Amino acid sequence: MHAYRSHTCAELRKAHVGQTARISGWIHRKRDHGGLLFIDLRDHYGLTQVVLEPESPHFATLERLRVESVITVTGEVIARSDETVNANLPTGEIEVRLAELAIQSEAEELPLPVFGEPDWSEEVRLKHRYIDLRRESLHKRIVLRSKIIDSLRRRMVDENFVEYQTPILTASSPEGARDFLVPSRVHPGKFYALPQAPQQFKQLIMVSGFDRYFQIAPCFRDEDARADRAPGEFYQLDMEMSFATQQDVFDVIEPVMKGLFDEFADGRTVPDEPFVQIAYKDAMSWYGSDKPDLRNPIKMSDASETFRGSGFKVFAGMLERNPKVQVWAIPAKTGGSRAFCDRMNSWAQKEGQPGMGYIFWREAEGGLEAAGPIAKNIGEERTEALRVELGLEAGDACFFAAGDPREFAGFAGRARDVVGAELDLCEKDTFRFCWIVDFPMYEWDEDNKKIDFSHNPFSMPQIDPDDFLKLDADTDADTLLALKAYQYDIVCNGVELSSGAVRNHRPDVMLKAFAFAGYDAATVEEEFGGMLNAFRYGAPPHAGVAPGVDRMIMLLAGVENLREVVMFPKDQQARDLMMNAPAEVELKQLRELHIRTVVPDAKKG
């Protein structure tokens, strides 16, 4: 018999009754019933109940051992009596009567419990993550993570993609976040950077003649933590394809994503239809966000014309003074009560706004009656036209937000979210995907009075390249600000899973694109010379995308924090509490790297 086990703790069944088995694992729980000692023994696979009588020579030892001690048990598999069968356990029809015991490791008093999984502080959980990972729910999520990544790999291979690895030590590049820098011992005063993404490398793979690339790629960014953003490092399904249009990328990734989510849906629905494509401008207007949660059926409407020149002087005055101002109408089915309208008004005040305008409709003699101060101020005709346009009836309401879209679209979007949640309008147990497309290529930088990139500077503009080269920053500023880019995001249930683009593969177009944003050729050559030079020797049109693996797992696992699907995560301050990182290093190590630390004075107060 094997030294540690003949079976796992999830393997024994009624068919094994009468056999001698050896199992190993952690003491999950101990119970003393009628003089008998019952032990739930746990390993990676499951639980098996072990029983021993008071006369057993090992009784006192097992009574003394703390839970989470590791033992090996040898004994006869016996059937449980009918009244003691545990139907919730795969091994619930049997138990092992202990004959031999080997103690592999004794546990000290635990800093956090495993059995029962009570709430515990995140600091304690992360400091003792190896114990936290024994808890069933987290343990299952980490196994789920492995299965999801395996499924992604299989699906990409089925789409004729080949996995290639890109360097971890690379050059610093001015992307969205700060780099993690690695000093070079061999080249004093110079630094590598950990890649924020394999962006330039995957494009160079296309230039190198490979057709379809993918990688489960580690990415490193020195940025602050959020619930949906892990500090320090994360993984993405990085992909790129040659001779590809935007639609080609969609046609590849959609079946991968739908298939993955369907495989791990666990009773939730994944709609069969193609992902909805929503222009960035429409997303901001309809949902107040470029990552809308489409489980919420509310689609906001531009009500600017309803209020222009109306008796509601607050909105009418804003529209008259600033042509950029927009009024959002947020329809609220079933929200037509003064109590709910007052709650929304209070919510807006907590958000730093003076309040929230509203109209609600109720039954009255002779038909519908519109209530609320806005209805009185804009008049019956405008109120009724708005109601008809939005398809609202008695018992419904409409809320209003007004301002410059750059500042107030987000507030309107949050109001939409609150209305949908409070009124229980949102779909449950489903995944709603969409593409956000047609991002603006440029935007006006009011502070510096110049044109600047709006999102991704390396995407191809939606214009004939030769026509783009003829544009002039001074005379064609309006054309440039109206120009869209071949950029796209995947969004699921309000979570941005990925950004992607058709790449700008022509050096002349790239230099011109950067010139419009105020970058001279020398700066572009210095920052991105490696990729630019490669493009000068024959670059295919190419496009790609990179869905975030951690965020996909978070959605499929049904949790709201990435740390619940990462095996060894950092805390909110990007610290590894278990390994005590970051930490000071020896002076000798710094000398070898020809660097020294200059630690700022601690902040007072």
From Swiss-Prot:
PROSITE patterns: AA_TRNA_LIGASE_II
E.C. code: 6.1.1.23
Any single biological process term in GO: aspartyl-tRNA aminoacylation
Subcellular location: Cytoplasm
Catalysed reaction equations from the record: tRNA(Asx) + L-aspartate + ATP = L-aspartyl-tRNA(Asx) + AMP + diphosphate
Binding site for L-aspartate: 175, 221, 455, 503
Xref: CDD domains: AspRS_core, EcAspRS_like_N
Residue sites binding ATP per the record: 221-223, 496, 548-551
Group of enzyme by EC: ligase
Alphabetized SUPFAM superfamilies for the sequence: Class II aaRS and biotin synthetases, GAD domain-like, Nucleic acid-binding proteins
Region (Aspartate) residue spans: 199-202
Pfam families, sorted: GAD, tRNA-synt_2, tRNA_anti-codon
Alphabetized InterPro entries for the sequence: Aa-tRNA-synt_II, aa-tRNA-synth_II, aa-tRNA-synth_II/BPL/LPL, Asp-tRNA-ligase_1, Asp-tRNA-ligase_1_N, Asp/Asn-tRNA-synth_IIb, AspRS_core, GAD-like_sf
Site-annotated residues for Important for tRNA non-discrimination: 33
Cellular component GO terms held in the UniProt record: cytoplasm
Chain's role: Aspartyl-tRNA synthetase with relaxed tRNA specificity since it is able to aspartylate not only its cognate tRNA(Asp) but also tRNA(Asn). Reaction proceeds in two steps: L-aspartate is first activated by ATP to form Asp-AMP and then transferred to the acceptor end of tRNA(Asp/Asn).
Protein name: Aspartate--tRNA(Asp/Asn) ligase
Natural source organism: Maricaulis maris (strain MCS10) (Caulobacter maris)
Gene: aspS
